Amino acid sequence: FAIRRQRQMCIRDSYISLPKFYIDFNDRKSRNSANDVKNEIIKLKNNGIVGLILDLRNNGGGALQTVVDMTGLFIEKGPIVQVKSTGNRKQILYDKDPQVVWDGPLVILMNKMSASASEILAGALQDYNRAVIIGNEKSFGKGTVQNVIDLNRFISNSSYDLGALKITTDKFYRINGESVQLEGVKSDIVI
């Protein structure tokens, strides 16, 4: 997580690099990338920034609820992503908070290694016409949701750590209904 402030030709733009959508599973409410980015944006606004660049290049994803919360920093409220599980059971995840932390110009940088949660954020903000996506022709194209199961919670073993199992449980779709699986999020400006 890095922040760089630049001043060019009397225009103030700020840059936030986000390598993944992290969360502390022991303190989900306060220790996550959405809260950290929110706090940084508030500081940057107090310093008079005019534009914001969010760098998601090489961001392979992360916690689903964190990306929903982060998307909510840039829109009033509404659907963020559709999640479909076995049997085509569909759940729509919403931003329910009408507070917008940043409503100014927003650029998202992506590349071929931007995947999963990065594609949820970029796709939703593109669907809301809220951000300009700049990068490779398209992002990675990972339209699936995975869950981590801590095996130590299910099997009693005091001798050693049993580890965890990561399984794919759902597919996700943009709010416009499109899948990013193998297709990715297409950049508005290709560099």
Q: How does the language model describe each region?
A:
Residues S159-K171:
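Short acidic, Pro/Gly- and aromatic-enriched capping/linker segments at domain boundaries
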